[in-house]
Amino acid sequence: MITLTYRIETPGSVETMADKIASDQSTGTFVPVPGETEELKSRVAARVLAIRPLENARHPTWPESAPDTLLHRADVDIAFPLEAIGTDLSALMTIAIGGVYSIKGMTGIRIVDMKLPEAFRSAHPGPQFGIAGSRRLTGVEGRPIIGTIVKPALGLRPHETAELVGELIGSGVDFIKDDEKLMSPAYSPLKERVAAIMPRILDHEQKTGKKVMYAFGISHADPDEMMRNHDIVAAAGGNCAVVNINSIGFGGMSFLRKRSSLVLHAHRNGWDVLTRDPGAGMDFKVYQQFWRLLGVDQFQINGIRIKYWEPDESFVSSFKAVSTPLFDAADCPLPVAGSGQWGGQAPETYERTGRTIDLLYLCGGGIVSHPGGPAAGVRAVQQAWQAAVAGIPLEVYAKDHPELAASIAKFSDGKGA
């Protein structure tokens, strides 16, 4: 069985709405039909497993009831037979998720959990590299992978990007990425950008033995064009790509993963429209399962004290979600903490994510805007993580670590990174 948990908000009966979801999303329609036999329903009809009442509300998520109407709320578990859906993710999205938002009689519905049976394990490839592969390719063990982003996000020409990358790879950083907004614009075609950047990365590897992982933006609405972008990166010796998962969709991701030799770094831009209203959409816990099955290797999930709307608690639950095996540990992608990060968030990130160092800690301005330059910025972030793991307050550790001290002086007001 495939089990979904729906958080229902309705001025009517929760039980009635639960039954309606189970019926409408499986065998039922607005009137009984001759073909809806008991035998058919026994095979493919969804059924309500449990209803857990929640506190009533007075403010509707959707404006379909007058303000101050009493609204009943509950978490409802509904099970769908595997025979009714199969293991196709587009079928799962359509049957168990897509149609529920249009059902009449609710003022809000949010999907808060999804449990998939073992059949999904073998039906989808999952991550090709994940945590272990990302560590192997960056050569980083015993600490978080430290990354940065090319800034400004847009406008740099290939030779200008390469100049900045040359400075960054000399800083000791482990990972660099194109901003998610940069793909292949006329002023910086991907082919030219790759040709400008990769020789610097390979030359640095030849001299030092360290190959910095660079994630190029290869997303495209045409899967064939996206695959050609992939091949440009791979042929030049690259090993990572930024993929805007909501823009390319399930089909694009599936097409890419089956043919990919690159680490696939998932950026979820656009995700907010699916989750920002707490009474509608879905939890990240549900959303991320689709993309992990499809094969993302690294998953960007914001961080602590970010520059966007998402609260810290949401990041913590997202981190837990991607770090929890669907079926086994190999299907966990590398969590990527980013957005306004510098070393100052390292202690809280470490403590609130289960004291793990298995993450990519992504700092844009927190590295490139350091008063001592990018190399000092990288050292400051590394020092912050050393302090976090050792349980030493940053201010104490900074007394003997000038790069961290300078970082605290610049960024501790929360406005600089």
Swiss-Prot record:
Cofactor names: Mg(2+)
GO biological process, alphabetically ordered: carbon fixation
Keywords: Carbohydrate metabolism, Decarboxylase, Lyase, Magnesium, Metal-binding, Plasmid
Pfam families (UniProt xref): RuBisCO_large, RuBisCO_large_N
Catalysed reactions, as listed in the record: 3-oxoisoapionate 4-phosphate + H(+) = L-erythrulose 1-phosphate + CO2
Family: Belongs to the RuBisCO large chain family.
Protein name per UniProt: 3-oxo-isoapionate-4-phosphate decarboxylase
